[in-house]
């Protein structure tokens, strides 16, 4: 890749004494793994540049799975994420690192990611609605198509007052059962619109995205969830934003109250 691409750092880890091994999320090639030689050395021009949430222009070379970074420049200052919003950003970064195929075009998802980060950077309330919308966008880009507005059994439009049960790879069918796989027609409509006007629809969105993402994530837990739990434990008298996140995530259906 000789030209410049817009990119964000999803993950970085030390490599040898002075280098970094990076996962980039790029506008044209999706997730790309890049070796930044000497990036940790004291005199490196890249020192402090290769940070998460900083919009970059980058170029690299190489034909193998791991490319060699040739240059990287910040397009602007890093997006100012802190506290709850920072951990939310780390969560979506880890999601992308875990589920995206290597070097696959996700150009539309790149803008969904950028918009989510921009929302988090300017938000003062709970990040939960933005996270749910991003998860739904991610599932759509992964090819996980679900019709929220029609019963998979009859083809009829969903009724707000009825209950529907989710069946993987089939969709939602009318049901009298009430369990973690059950959703009201009103909740399904909220999922289709990406708008969550109350706690019930927000919790329903979280239940659905947890179920839908599970096959992509496997059994390995997300590190960002553990970091987020530690963050909340350190702040027993949480701010309004943290309290809202706990409330929105507190359905107990998947054992991760207060997580993203």
Curated annotation (Swiss-Prot):
Native species: Sodalis glossinidius (strain morsitans)
InterPro entries in the record: ARFGAP/RecO, DNA_rep/recomb_RecO_N, NA-bd_OB-fold, RecO, RecO_C
GO CC terms of this entry: bacterial nucleoid
Name of encoding gene: recO
Family to which this protein belongs: Belongs to the RecO family.
GO biological process: DNA recombination; double-strand break repair
Record protein name field: DNA repair protein RecO
Keyword annotations of the record: DNA damage, DNA recombination, DNA repair
UniProt-annotated stretches for the region Disordered: 239-260
